[in-house]
């Protein structure tokens, strides 16, 4: 008889829940709920389990916020809870609450070739560190290492490191944004709001007044080639994505590959392919040759957060991935 566990991927707006076959890792019966419609994460879980008439003993839910102890307070939602109390209330034997990019990193060993698009470099080296990052509402970062037949995710808040410009144009962006907001992290330029910041800084650098555009507007105008400022912003976004990925590769020696997740890049895939992304990735001066062979992949799996939550839980329960 198939034994299932509950898996989840929770952001500021939606909570996506599914079942994971503990033996195979297969994800099924995924459903998305609006977080605004429920008073707590526990309430959403109960609704899902009732709707699917399933009894589970184990669960793993990825959440887009730092996980530093038993008490979880979401940074982009009002939900807050004790992991131990939620586990007890649901009657679970195991309940893991992990960072969303911990989940994405743990999905990588489970991905197949059809879930990936490669952007330069050679073949990944087995056993070497892996980096994963992705731009969405914010900028998520994690690393993954393989030790004693176990995958160990190294999550952090790497999206909040300093934005490090490496051209006159990027330095100008930094100067304008610093005058507006003070500390300029990588996330301030590599995210949906970050794309807006790039556009605004580009326009302001020419002593003009920027329009009140959303990330979607900037992308659409750039792809339609109807706004040179939007096109410059999107082009610069791609280059800085490359630079940041190259920084991750240098920091951990990620010869196992660098993986891009998140919802932004797939929206302008053809533009990204033709952009200066790989050039930015390899623009490391004396260490260009060091980084040249490191492959970069875009993850195109529909639910890497659910897949990785399942992988994390299965490994916790003693399965070898």
Swiss-Prot record:
- Annotated NCBIfam families: glk (TIGR00749), PRK00292.1-1 (NF001414), PRK00292.1-3 (NF001416)
Q: What family does the Swiss-Prot or TrEMBL record give for this protein?
A: Belongs to the bacterial glucokinase family.
Q: Is Transferase given among the entry's keywords?
A: yes
- Which Gene3D superfamilies does the record associate with it? 3.30.420.40, 3.40.367.20
UniProt keywords (A-Z) are: ATP-binding, Cytoplasm, Glycolysis, Kinase, Nucleotide-binding, Transferase
This protein is called what?
Glucokinase
The gene name on file is glk
Q: Which chemical reaction does it catalyze?
A: D-glucose + ATP = D-glucose 6-phosphate + ADP + H(+)
Instruction: List the InterPro entries.
Output: ATPase_NBD, Bacterial_glucokinase, Glucokinase
Give GO BP annotations, semicolon-separated.
Answer: glycolytic process
Which species does this protein come from? Salmonella paratyphi B (strain ATCC BAA-1250 / SPB7)
Q: Where is this gene product found?
A: Cytoplasm
Q: Which residues bind ATP?
A: 8-13
Q: What EC designation does it have?
A: 2.7.1.2
In its keyword annotation, does this UniProt entry include Cytoplasm? Answer: yes
């Amino acid at each position: 008889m198939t034994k299932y566990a509950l898996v989840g991927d929770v952001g500021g707006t939606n909570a996506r829940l599914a079942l994971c076959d503990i033996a195979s890792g297969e994800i099924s019966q995924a459903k998305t709920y609006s977080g605004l419609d429920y008073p707590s994460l526990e309430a959403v879980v109960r609704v899902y389990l009732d709707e699917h008439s399933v009894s589970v003993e184990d669960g793993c839910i990825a959440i887009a916020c730092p996980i530093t102890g038993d008490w979880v307070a979401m940074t982009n939602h009002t939900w807050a809870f004790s992991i131990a109390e939620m586990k007890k209330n649901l009657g679970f034997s195991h309940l893991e609450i992990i960072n969303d990019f911990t989940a994405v990193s743990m999905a990588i060993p489970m991905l197949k070739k059809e879930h990936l698009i490669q952007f330069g470099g050679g073949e990944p080296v087995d056993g070497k560190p892996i980096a994963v990052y992705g731009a969405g509402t914010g900028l998520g970062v994690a690393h993954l290492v393989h030790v004693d037949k176990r995958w160990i995710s190294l999550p952090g808040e790497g999206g909040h490191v300093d934005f490090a410009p490496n051209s006159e144009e990027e330095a100008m962006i930094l100067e304008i944004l610093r005058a507006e907001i003070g500390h300029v992290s990588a996330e301030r330029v590599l995210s949906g709001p970050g794309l807006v910041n790039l556009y605004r800084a580009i326009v302001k650098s020419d002593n003009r007044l920027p329009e009140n555009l959303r990330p979607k507007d900037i992308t659409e105008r750039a792809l339609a080639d109807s706004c040179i400022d939007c096109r410059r912003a999107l082009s610069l976004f791609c280059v800085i994505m490359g630079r940041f990925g190259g920084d991750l590769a240098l920091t951990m020696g990620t010869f196992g590959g660098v993986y891009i997740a998140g919802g932004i890049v797939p929206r302008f895939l053809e533009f990204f392919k033709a952009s200066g992304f790989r050039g930015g990735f390899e623009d490391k001066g004396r260490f260009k040759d060091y980084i040249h062979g490191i492959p970069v992949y875009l993850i195109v799996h529909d639910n890497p957060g659910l897949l990785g939550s399942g992988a994390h839980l299965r490994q916790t329960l003693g399965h070898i991935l």
